[in-house]
């Protein structure tokens, strides 16, 4: 009875190991704002002036992002395709025959132990004394292919203004639906003149860009094999 109980317990553990670990539903902390954000210095108020810096932009400039703290809309359109293919074929075939045309003036000999020429066992020059041959062939093929497509829109914040009109932007978005959370994180450099009149910029115009799109939840867990399957893949030598 004890053996049957132990066997049943081991079977249950093995079956449980093939399933992905369940994730407990717990509130996730919101995406933290960029750490490099620096609050711009406020100009001293001038009560005697009709206009101030905060309202001057509405009259003398457009609404495109150009200062620290401004918001710019980044349109993520990433299409990446890569393919590599290699074929190798190598073949070599060689045959070598070595014969003696004459031996001490004789062109033939009979099999006679007392006659050293007879050791050749026949006519001199007709039978090969040494024959070698070799043949080798190699066929190799390899192919890799990868394709990625990401399309999204995210609002990013200007965290730094660099010389030459470069804007360092960072942004993040968190979306949760039925305990499934999706994250989009973006950072990069963009020229202020590349920002369109509607305060948007394409992700292909970002330099040193980093775009991450990942998720956490039930669907993400189902994408991975169980812990026992991963353990066996690491330990199995074949």
From Swiss-Prot:
A lipid is attached at residue 18 (S-diacylglycerol cysteine). Residues 1-17 form the signal peptide. It is found in: Cell outer membrane; Bacterial flagellum basal body. A lipid is attached at residue 18 (N-palmitoyl cysteine). GO terms for biological process: bacterial-type flagellum-dependent cell motility. Assembles around the rod to form the L-ring and probably protects the motor/basal body from shearing forces during rotation. NCBIfam families: PRK12696.1 (NF009336). HAMAP family: FlgH. This is Flagellar L-ring protein. It comes from Nitratidesulfovibrio vulgaris (strain ATCC 29579 / DSM 644 / CCUG 34227 / NCIMB 8303 / VKM B-1760 / Hildenborough) (Desulfovibrio vulgaris). The lineage of its organism: Bacteria, Pseudomonadati, Thermodesulfobacteriota, Desulfovibrionia, Desulfovibrionales. The gene is flgH.
């Amino acid at each position: 009875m004890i053996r049957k109980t132990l066997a049943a317990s081991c079977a249950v553990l093995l079956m449980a190991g093939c399933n992905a670990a369940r994730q407990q539903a717990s509130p996730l902390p919101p995406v933290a704002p960029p750490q490099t954000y620096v609050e711009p210095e406020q100009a001293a108020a001038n009560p005697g002036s009709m206009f101030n810096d905060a309202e001057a932009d509405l009259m003398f400039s457009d609404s495109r992002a150009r200062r620290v703290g401004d918001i710019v809309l980044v349109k993520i359109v990433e299409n990446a395709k890569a393919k590599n293919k290699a074929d190798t074929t190598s073949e070599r075939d060689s045959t070598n025959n070595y014969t003696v045309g004459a031996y001490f003036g004789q062109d033939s000999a009979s099999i006679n132990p007392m006659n050293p020429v007879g050791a050749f066992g026949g006519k001199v020059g007709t039978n090969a004394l040494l024959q070698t041959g070799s043949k080798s062939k190699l066929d190799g093929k390899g192919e890799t292919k990868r394709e990625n497509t990401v399309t999204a829109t995210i609002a990013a914040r200007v965290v730094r203004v660099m010389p030459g009109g470069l804007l360092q932007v960072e942004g993040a978005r968190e979306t949760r639906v039925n305990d499934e959370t999706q994250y989009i994180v973006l950072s990069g450099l963009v020229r202020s003149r590349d920002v369109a009149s509607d305060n948007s910029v394409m992700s292909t115009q970002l330099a040193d860009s980093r775009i991450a799109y990942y998720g956490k939840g039930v669907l993400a867990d189902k994408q991975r094999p169980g812990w026992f399957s991963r353990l066996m893949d690491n330990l199995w030598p074949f």
